């Protein structure tokens, strides 16, 4: 018991940095996680598994979705609810798709301590939602959503996610200066400020409602060329009588009326004439009202602050199951998170790449052997076949 407490203490304050949460799924136990029973008939089941072709059957264990076309909800309580006030917060995890995903979320959520994990679902309030989301060709992105004053705010930038079948590492760093970074596979893919890249605050500047466009403002960029004249021979009818048409032999003017030639398209017809367009010498550009300070804007130096973080959870809809979540870490040290990412993710990813390359090489060699065999003369092929003769006993 003492050794367990010591391990927990060391993990929380490892080497001078704080670890608020860590989960590496060292065995197949799922007892620390609570699966949601909300809308139970549509809920899929999470299991701790290593997937179809793990690099290491123990190291690769993770929280896996197991049923197609299901909602998923699961959460684990953080031993001590925390706030990131005055500190950097790093949220990191790995995800591997065990099969090709046509549509499915693979993002993590941080939840308040007042959540009921058994009733956890898509409308449950959360602090942060972070991670990949794939649906068809249109959606392949990393979500970064903050809840600010009760409203969820999506990042205004597009961050592409990985959609292959290898393990990938996703990292979000939120700093106390309201700056953030997003890393994929320990490489920075986006950074900026919470104020600029989310609409959590009203804009600093707005249009002056009292500013009016001057009466003589010209905002028409192009005008008709006054010197361009319509050619004299332009006006030709759209259709003309077909001179090759013949009056039917059985046409009776008394009964059928006077026969008229049918119309056909006129090859000389040029359509409606319009003068060419030229730059307007009086054009002043697009008029915009003067910008003034927004009286509704108020700087908030604590946009980054998330209080009472009490649960880690996954709330997903997946058409294609098989997502494996692992190596979940919440810490105040980007350096420690990077080290852990390299230690836990890198060797697995490199092994998966090597395995993929080896498989591709084997497939190529097999295809070449098959091709060579097909190109052999018939006699050569026959000589390779086992003989049908048998020695007599």
From Swiss-Prot:
SUPFAM superfamilies: Concanavalin A-like lectins/glucanases, P-domain of calnexin/calreticulin. A motif (Prevents secretion from ER) lies at residues 390-393. One of its GO terms (molecular function) is unfolded protein binding. Residues 217-226 have a biased composition (Acidic residues). Sequence repeats lie at residues 189-200, 208-219, 225-236, 242-253, 257-267, 271-281, 285-295. An alpha-D-glucoside binds at residues 107, 109, 126, 133, 315. Glycans are attached at residue 27. Residues 257-295 are annotated as: 3 X 11 AA approximate repeats. Keywords: Calcium, Chaperone, Disulfide bond, Endoplasmic reticulum, Glycoprotein, Lectin, Metal-binding, Repeat, Signal, Zinc. Residues 194-277, 351-393 are annotated as: Disordered. Disulfide bonds join 103-135. It is found in: Endoplasmic reticulum lumen. It comes from the Eukaryota. GO terms for biological process: ERAD pathway; protein folding. Can be divided into a N-terminal globular domain, a proline-rich P-domain forming an elongated arm-like structure and a C-terminal acidic domain. The P-domain binds one molecule of calcium with high affinity, whereas the acidic C-domain binds multiple calcium ions with low affinity. This is Calreticulin.
């Amino acid at each position: 018991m003492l050794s367990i407490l010591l391990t927990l203490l060391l993990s929380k304050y490892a080497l001078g940095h704080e670890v608020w949460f860590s989960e590496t799924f060292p065995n197949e136990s799922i007892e620390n996680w609570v699966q949601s029973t909300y809308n139970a008939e549509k809920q899929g089941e999470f299991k701790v598994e290593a997937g179809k072709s793990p690099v290491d059957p123990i190291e690769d264990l993770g929280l896996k979705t197991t049923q197609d076309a299901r909602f998923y909800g699961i959460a684990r309580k953080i031993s001590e609810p925390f706030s990131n006030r005055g500190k950097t917060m790093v949220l990191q995890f790995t995800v591997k798709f065990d099969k090709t995903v046509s549509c499915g979320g693979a993002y993590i959520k941080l939840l308040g301590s007042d959540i009921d994990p058994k009733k956890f679902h898509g409308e449950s309030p959360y602090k942060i939602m972070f991670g990949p989301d794939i649906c068809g060709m249109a959606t392949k992105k990393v979500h970064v959503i903050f809840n600010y004053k009760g409203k969820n705010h999506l990042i205004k930038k597009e961050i592409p996610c990985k959609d292959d079948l290898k393990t990938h590492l996703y990292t979000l760093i939120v700093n106390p200066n309201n700056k953030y970074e997003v890393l994929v596979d320990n490489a920075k893919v986006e950074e900026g400020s919470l104020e600029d890249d989310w609409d959590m605050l009203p804009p600093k500047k707005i249009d002056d409602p009292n500013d009016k466009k001057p009466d003589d403002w010209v905002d028409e960029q192009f005008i008709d060329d006054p010197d361009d004249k319509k050619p004299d021979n332009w006006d030709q009818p759209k259709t003309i009588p077909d001179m090759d048409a013949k009056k039917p032999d059985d046409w009776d003017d008394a009964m059928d009326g006077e026969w008229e030639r049918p119309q056909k398209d006129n090859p000389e017809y040029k359509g409606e004439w319009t003068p060419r367009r030229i730059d307007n010498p009086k054009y002043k550009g697009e008029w915009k009202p003067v910008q003034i300070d927004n009286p509704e804007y108020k700087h908030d130096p604590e946009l980054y602050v998330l209080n009472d973080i009490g649960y880690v959870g996954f709330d997903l809809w997946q058409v294609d199951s098989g997502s494996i979540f692992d190596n979940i870490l919440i810490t105040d040290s980007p350096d420690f998170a990077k080290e852990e990412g390299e230690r836990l993710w890198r060797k697995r990813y490199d092994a998966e790449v090597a395995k993929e390359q080896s498989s591709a090489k084997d497939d190529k060699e097999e295809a070449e052997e098959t091709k060579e065999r097909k190109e052999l003369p018939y006699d050569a092929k026959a000589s390779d076949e086992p003989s049908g003769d048998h020695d007599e006993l």
